[in-house]
A protein has these predicted regions:
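Short, structured interface segments
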Residues: 22-31, 258-268
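Short, surface-exposed amphipathic charged segments that create phosphate/polyanion-binding patches used
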Residues: 125-131, 240-244, 289
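Catalytic subdomain that performs nucleotidyl-dependent activation
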Residues: 133, 167-250, 255, 310
């Protein structure tokens, strides 16, 4: 019977294939906290006095991000706030919103719930009933980023923290490479910034934590999380890439780490030759940064017969 490598506790909750480490709940929590703190320190994700807005869906990744970053708030290093987006998916979104509200109240932080309906005059359920929609994920990603960035400015946030984990990041690296999206590759990483003052820098504290460990961390700490999957989730190229990586990881446990470590070494060269797209103008309707007359949000809304509710 295995015992905790760190303290000898026989109640082991995980054995890491990549290192052979067996850990009890307490030592596992400490190891994840330490790994995230190392990422924050090495990548300079937080500065003293920062106001950080967490994109809080109520799912495991965002709840764990909030929980770990809150330790910096408790030490008076940063100020913390959160935004939760209600896409308007009946029978699914309400639970996640309620969980997010509960966590924000528990920590006593500023929190806003912003809906697609209030911002755009139409929610995702209504969009999916139209005949000419582009697919749920297309709208959801673009609309969510618009709301997150705009709300960060309203909060006066210096950073936006998202719950992207190791699986997410390694998928993004491989997916963009396979599709030849080199400009997109240059905008990945633990910290992403923009030349536009209207874009708030984004940080990914969980970037080196596997998805499985994020879920186990939430369970070990007794954190309430939204477990349901989105009813609009569909098989996508990202999912295919994710499945490939998971299959490779079975025999090569360090594969996902290798993907992002290799990417981090190449990033300076990629960024130098393929800089991220800079939106030099502003959208004629909503005023958000855009290279064209209309940003993607306003373009999509125009197709749907709606416009941003300013």
């Amino acid at each position: 019977m295995s015992v905790c490598t760190k303290c000898g506790n026989p109640n082991v909750i995980i054995t890491r294939k990549q290192s052979g480490q067996s850990l009890c709940a307490d030592c596992f929590i400490k190891s994840v906290d330490k790994k995230v703190q190392q990422t924050i320190r090495r990548e300079k994700l937080l500065n003293k006095g920062d106001k950080v807005m967490v994109a809080l869906s109520g799912g495991k990744d965002s709840v764990v991000t909030l929980d770990i970053i809150n330790s910096y708030r408790e030490r008076h290093v940063i100020d913390l706030c959160a935004v939760t987006i209600d896409e308007g998916i009946k029978g699914y979104r309400n639970e996640g919103v309620d969980i997010a509200i509960s966590h924000a109240k528990r920590l006593g932080i500023e929190h806003k719930v912003v809906s697609f309906k209030d911002c755009f005059g139409i929610d995702l359920d209504e969009i999916m009933k139209t005949d000419n929609h582009r697919g749920s994920c297309t709208y959801c990603g673009v609309f969510r980023r618009w709301i997150i960035n705009r709300t960060a400015r309203e909060f006066g946030a210096d950073k936006i923290a998202t719950g992207h984990n190791l699986d997410d990041e390694s998928q993004a690296v491989l997916m963009n490479y396979l599709e030849g999206n080199i400009n997109n590759l240059s905008s990945l990483g633990a910290l992403t910034t923009s030349k536009s003052p209207k874009f708030t820098p984004k940080i990914k504290p969980l970037r080196e934590i596997p998805e499985k460990e994020v879920g186990l961390y939430a369970l070990a700490k007794g954190l309430d999380i939204h477990l349901a999957g989105c009813p609009y989730a569909q098989e996508s190229f990202r999912m295919e890439v994710g499945n490939i990586l998971k299959d490779l990881t079975k025999d090569h446990p360090t594969m996902m780490y290798s993907v992002i470590k290799g990417y981090d070494k190449l990033k300076p060269l990629v960024k130098e030759n393929y800089p991220p797209e800079f939106h030099q103008g502003d959208c004629a309707i909503c005023g958000e940064p855009s290279s064209n007359e209309l940003c993607r949000v306003c373009t999509f809304l125009k197709e749907l017969g709606h416009r941003v509710q300013l």
